[in-house]
């Protein structure tokens, strides 16, 4: 970084230190946004693949009831 960034009193051809720090901040921000979008996309594809797999599998078990109806009185009995 010292080859590219110099202080304001340096010779011409180098970038000012404040500009260099700003560019590093912008590069880190862009890299972070890229990582965020990339991870979100991978997670979306993984969830979609997992959902299709779960919907595509046939269950041999007949007792796959998730919700079971109950009488209204049973909820209030203690």
UniProtKB/Swiss-Prot annotation:
The keyword Transmembrane applies. Belongs to the HHV-5 UL41A protein family. InterPro entries: Herpesvirus_UL41A (IPR020141). It holds the Pfam family UL41A. It is found in: Virion membrane. It comes from Human cytomegalovirus (strain Merlin). One of its GO terms (cellular component) is membrane. Keywords: Glycoprotein, Membrane, Transmembrane, Transmembrane helix, Virion. The chain crosses the membrane at residues 19-39. The keyword Nucleotide-binding does not apply. This is Protein UL41A. It is a single-pass membrane protein.
């Amino acid at each position: 970084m010292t080859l590219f960034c110099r202080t304001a009193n340096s010779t011409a051809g180098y970038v000012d230190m404040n500009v260099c720090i700003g560019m590093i901040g912008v590069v880190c921000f862009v890299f972070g946004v890229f990582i965020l979008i990339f991870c979100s996309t991978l997670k979306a594809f993984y969830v979609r693949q997992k959902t299709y797999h779960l919907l595509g599998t046939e269950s041999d078990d007949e007792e796959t009831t998730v919700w079971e109806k109950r009488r209204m009185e049973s909820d209030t009995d203690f």
